């Protein structure tokens, strides 16, 4: 009998897992028809450099994330660099100071300070068209760097990946997933935690045909802009012409911008579960058109920000559920609120101007939402079929280099370049 070395056996199993990996489910909502890397052979990159190369190249790919890819320290650090103390930080080390980004006056007259941060987190990895990025089980983690989809890219699937630890101590520390001028993007079964800025953001250029589904936005943090252990910068939609389906997601321990939506956009938010939000969830600004149905809000202080709602919002209650039939081909589902504030918005103009490209959207009644979402949203749950724990079994804790001075320091020129490059592309 031939005995195989355990390491060789493990490597063989991982290789087989990568080859067998494929997308689970079918894109729906505005992202219907997205195919990503299609029939390209699934392959797992060997290291962070190869991952970056594969994401950015012009070839259709199915990129398998079968382990943790840790980018912290890969682009050096900025030590004792310019930062500021915003008015929101009234709690010292438990709050968030802000990185002073060149080309932006965000820090303005705030008191200056210095801080040390990781350069890799400032700018996401660029993702080219026709890509599928898919994690294996709960092992697929991208630490210290996000994903950036810009400049007309299209046909991309991101599924079953955990993005975490992008300079969570600092405002402007990095965005997990950013879109700016895209089409046909499906973000599914993703988890985001411990970021400095946005968990999911669309920039000023239109991102049409986007669905964010079955994902977990975990706002628990030691560095909170609201000084309460909840992350403020959560989901932001700024694209002119965005069309986004936001369904079956778990948004918890946030304190604002969950989401903030502006400009000429259409968002359909249904069957999401908001839990333990100490501030506001929806913040609907000028030009936005938002349909909110079949969601559950539990212990959410302010489901709709009343101070900034010049946009058009239709938040469905039991009395007007039938109004949706002409727009969606079915009645809407009323929202449910428990130990929460008021969810306002009754503008039926949202329905009369609803885009035709969303296709069929099947919504469940709110009594099923909390258990379904907590069992299915996030990583490691592609085959859960409605069962499982509320969060990933991957234990995410900040690595030592993120809160202490790292072993290597960037030269002044490389740090300045990183800050300038970030500021040119991030004004939201």
Curated annotation (Swiss-Prot):
Subcellular location(s) of the protein: Secreted
The EC number(s) attached to this protein equal: 4.2.2.10
Reactions listed under catalytic activity = Eliminative cleavage of (1->4)-alpha-D-galacturonan methyl ester to give oligosaccharides with 4-deoxy-6-O-methyl-alpha-D-galact-4-enuronosyl groups at their non-reducing ends
Got any disulfides in this one, which pairs? 83-107, 324-332
Q: Where is this region: Disordered?
A: 383-428
User: Which protein family is named in the record?
Assistant: Belongs to the polysaccharide lyase 1 family.
Instruction: Specify the protein name.
Output: Probable pectin lyase F
Q: From which source organism is this entry?
A: Aspergillus oryzae (strain ATCC 42149 / RIB 40) (Yellow koji mold)
Q: Which gene encodes it?
A: pelF
